[in-house]
Amino acid sequence: MFNFTRQYSVKDGLITDELASHIVENLPARYASAETWKRIYSLQHDGASLQTMYLACEKEKARSGHPKGACILAVRDTDGDVFGVFIPDYLIPAPHYFGSEETFLWKYFPPKKYVHYPFVGNSNFVAYCTKSFLAFGGGNGRYSLWLDGSLEYAYSSRTPAFENNPLSYRGCPDQRIQIVDIELWVLE
């Protein structure tokens, strides 16, 4: 079993030890050895605001002194499914797409079903952060994961960037997903 240190006590957090062990199996080697996973944003504790999440990233970037940070975004929907993304960058608004081939999507359906979608490179649309939405993957007019600025809902569709199935268990592309919780973690 993978052991990691949590910066905060997260008794009911989205990333359980079991889920963390699945994510670690897919992390690039330089991040898989991270000993500390620090939660820098939680919708339940910090409020439903994309701007607050971006501000948490900016503060962490300034604190760490590193231009890039390894982030794990976890989302829980009203069906209880948890899904998200690993990206080796801070989530900060930019006027263009950013990210690398190390980025991947994942979904976790209790009990114990984990699916990993690596970046396949059929487009350069990895991540796009704006003041009004946050998106991962792109192409054909869709996003692999799109979250609105109020963090109340999301959409998920198959895209050329990840060739993923929709991340919500319902599996219906372009159907609104109601968000219950979001957490953003950085690896140190």
Swiss-Prot record:
Domain of life: Eukaryota
Swiss-Prot/TrEMBL GO biological process terms: meiotic cell cycle; regulation of cellular pH
Entry's localization field: Mitochondrion; Cytoplasm; Nucleus
Signal sequence region: none
Residue stretches making up the TLDc domain: 13-188
Function: May be involved in protection from oxidative damage. Has a role in meiosis.
Protein name listed in UniProt: Oxidation resistance protein 1
Originating species: Schizosaccharomyces pombe (strain 972 / ATCC 24843)
